[in-house]
């Protein structure tokens, strides 16, 4: 029973993501979500008290997916640049494989408590990486947020531009971007 409940909640979250990409966050209604998820409208209320609760849990899901993406194939025994490259590529490929997430990036910022969720995450992979690399004397003494904007955020920006401007980024160009964004945060 627990698995079925999790699957249905995931079905509702996937419908939320698709509907946001197609119609926008401000156009979401529980009725539209139910239709998109192929469930009865009342079924959604078995899982979520109201739209705000659904969207807040959805925000947690989106952020958790992003954190899991950073962790994928991460090996802290590798040199710092290799660790960085892995996180950068993880973000890039995650966004290539999840086009609705890419379409919804700006809208996620409008989700209830999304900014608070992002701020309150401590000891995530990126933070730990930054602290260890700073301790080793490799990274600039800037906050994790600033380091992220100068480095991993380039994967997000390029993925977004590649989708909407429709240009192809060859592997050697991506490698060059990874190397240059790494240099941007070095001491």
Curated annotation (Swiss-Prot):
Residues 6-66 form the HTH tetR-type domain. Keywords: DNA-binding, Repeat, Transcription, Transcription regulation. Coiled coil: none annotated. One of its GO terms (biological process) is regulation of DNA-templated transcription. Residues 29-48 bind DNA. One of its GO terms (molecular function) is DNA-binding transcription factor activity. It comes from the Bacteria. This is Uncharacterized HTH-type transcriptional regulator HI_0893. It comes from Haemophilus influenzae (strain ATCC 51907 / DSM 11121 / KW20 / Rd).
């Amino acid at each position: 029973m627990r698995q079925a409940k999790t699957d249905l909640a995931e079905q509702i979250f996937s419908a939320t993501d698709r509907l946001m990409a197609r119609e926008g966050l401000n156009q979401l209604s529980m009725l539209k979500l139910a239709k998109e998820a192929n469930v009865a409208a009342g079924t959604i209320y078995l899982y979520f008290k109201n739209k705000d609760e659904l969207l807040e849990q959805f925000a947690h899901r989106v952020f958790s997916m992003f954190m899991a993406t950073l962790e994928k194939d991460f090996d802290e025994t590798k040199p710092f640049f290799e660790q960085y490259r892995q996180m950068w590529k993880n973000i890039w490929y995650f966004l290539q494989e999840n086009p609705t997430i890419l379409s919804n990036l700006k809208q996620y910022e409008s989700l209830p408590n999304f900014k608070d969720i992002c701020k309150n995450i401590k000891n995530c992979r990126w933070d730990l990486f930054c602290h260890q690399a700073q301790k080793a004397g490799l990274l600039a003494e800037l906050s994790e947020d600033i380091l992220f904007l100068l480095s991993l955020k380039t994967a997000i920006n390029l993925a977004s531009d590649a989708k909407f401007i429709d240009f192809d980024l060859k592997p050697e160009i991506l490698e060059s971007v990874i190397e240059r964004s790494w240099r941007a945060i070095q001491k």
